[in-house]
Design a protein with these regions (language model features):
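Long, positively charged, glycine-interspersed low-complexity recognition regions
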Residues: 5-6, 237-238, 243-309
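Conserved proline-anchored active-site loop of SAM-dependent methyltransferases
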Residues: 30, 44-58, 67-71, 114-128, ...
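Short amphipathic alpha-helical segments and helix-helix/interface helices
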Residues: 31, 35, 55, 250-258
Length: 309
């Protein structure tokens, strides 16, 4: 089993695009595991890079990393965010109507895809973040908070939010009726759109990321690499693979990863691997599956390595 001294984990929040299947919750631990168990001077290949959480964490830790994802839409979004400023980030928040218009639009620009990403439920780009009953109320409130207070985080401390969170507004009967129907006091809760913008701002502030040159290759393109560290986060076995561009053959991938393990350090993220040539080397006991179904919440994230004899 690999070791992890959690006292050495970088302080501060994890960074990366709010992306479906992102490893942001455990990215700091994964990179620290690499640092504590292997030669961190080796080049790290983040081959299924997704929203860039592992890549960004490597950069924050001063490690050399190659950011790759087969889907150029996600790497284009990543590069767009790190090249822009805070005022541009504010333009990404959109209403339900605008979301639906962009969703039907073809072709989509990088900014279009970012707007769908930030404003979609589960960051899956297809359905709006809030239900129909809530969408206008929460969107309008988020826009008002940005315009009046210029904040993404800490929005619950603004007078605008506190006022909106009250169940009654003296003298405004129609508003009171609406608030009562929605159960505003109990349900207003989080304004996820502002929280998403905060994540983008954290990413944008990492100037060192501008030096990255992302690639969009299939994993087989790295077959000739030797003497490196590979962090692999492929589509998991027996799960939906919406976030992966194209079909994915898990067994073919395991064959490739096993071969690569003979001349490289290869770490694979998964819940389980059916191929007996791989063994679990670390388990993130607090990072559980959020997938739907009977097994939801029971499976934990793990790291696997090949057993080379």
């Amino acid at each position: 089993m690999l070791k992890l001294d959690e006292k050495k984990i970088r302080k501060g929040k994890p960074v990366g695009l709010p992306y479906q299947g992102s490893k942001k919750k455990i990215s700091k631990k994964i990179v620290e595991i690499i640092k504590q168990n292997f030669d961190a001077d080796k080049l790290i290949y983040d081959v299924f890079g997704g929203g860039g959480a592992i890549t960004a964490e490597c950069v924050l830790n001063g490690l050399e990393v190659h950011y790759n994802d087969l889907d150029n839409d996600i790497t284009d979004m990543f590069q767009r965010v790190i090249s822009q400023d805070r005022e541009w980030i504010k333009t990404l928040i959109i209403s339900r109507d605008e979301f639906n218009k962009i969703r039907q639009k073809e072709p989509k620009s990088v900014d279009d895809n970012l707007k769908l990403l930030v404003n979609s439920f589960g960051n899956e780009l297809s359905s709006y973040l809030y239900g129909a009953d809530w969408s206008d109320t929460k969107y309008d409130l988020a826009v008002e908070i940005i315009n009046k207070h210029d904040v993404f985080s800490g929005y619950k401390q603004t007078e605008t939010y506190k006022k909106a969170d009250k169940p009654y507004d003296e003298g405004e009967l129609e508003k009171n009726k609406k608030l009562t129907q929605l159960g505003q006091l109990q349900q207003l809760g989080r304004l996820q759109q502002l929280e998403q913008l905060q994540q983008l701002e954290q990413l944008q502030q990492l100037g060192r990321l501008e030096q990255l040159e992302p690639t969009n290759y299939s994993y087989e393109a790295f077959s000739d690499i030797e003497g490196a560290i590979f962090y692999l986060d492929p589509p998991y076995e027996n799960t939906t693979q919406k976030s992966y561009k194209g079909d994915f053959n898990s067994q073919a991938f395991y064959d490739w990863a096993f071969g690569m393990s003979k001349n490289n350090i290869v770490l694979i993220s998964s819940y389980d691997i059916s191929d007996e040539r791989f063994e679990c080397v670390y388990e993130f006991k607090t990072a559980r599956s959020t997938m739907q179904g009977g097994g939801a919440g029971k499976r934990t994230e793990k790291l696997f390595m090949a057993v080379i004899t």
